[in-house]
Amino acid sequence: MNYKKLSLLILLFSAGLMNVAAQKSPQDMDRFIDVLMKKMTLEEKIGQLNLPVTGEITTGQAKSSDIATKIKKGEVGGLFNLKGVDRIMDVQKQAVENSRLGIPLLFGMDVIHGYETMFPIPLGLSCTWDMTAIEESARIAAVEASADGINWTFSPMVDISRDPRWGRVSEGSGEDPFLGAMIAEAMVMGYQGKNMERNDEIMACVKHFALYGASEAGRD
C-alpha cells in the first residue's frame, strides 16, 4: 500500500465514511480506497492535505463562512481547533451533504496534557518515569476529546531539547532520547490504543520534523 492509500485509509477509518469501519478485510478496504481515489480530482486530493484553523466558527456560521465554500469544493481535509459538538456537527454536515464526494472532515486539536481534565505538562510528566500513569493520562484525554468531536491530536512531541531557553521545551520530555521514546510510545498507546477500533480513541500525530528541538540560543 502506498503512502497516498495509507493517508486516505487513516482518514476514512477515523471518520467512518460510508460505514468503512464495517469492512471485513484489508482487501475490501483497499478496493474501497481505490474506487474513491479514482473519483477524486487532483484538487480534491490536495484538499485532503489542507487543515485550516477555524476556531472562530460558531454554530450557524458554517453555511455562510468562507470555509464552507472551500469544504463544498473539496478543498479542506480537516479543521484545526474547532471545539464543541454542535459546531463540529454543523461543519461536518456541510462536508458530508454538500461536497461532491461527501468525504467527512477530520477535527484536530493540540491535546497536549489533557483535554478537560488537566495533567502536568509533558516535561513534568516525564519526571515521573511512570509509563502506566503517562499512558493513562493520554487515555483520559482521548476519551474526553473524542466525546467533544475531536479525532486527531498533535501529540506527543518527541523533540529532544537541551536548551531550556527554547519556548517549547515544556511540550517535550526533556533531553534524554531513551526516556522520550518510552513516553512517546506510552502516549500513542493511550491516545489510539492498539487498533483504533473504539469510538473513544483518537489519532496521535508524533511531532515535530527532524531537529526542530535543536534550536539556537533558544530561538524558535
What is each model feature region?
Residues 21-220:
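Glycoside hydrolase catalytic-domain context in secreted enzymes
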Residues 1-25:
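Bacterial Sec-dependent N-terminal signal peptides
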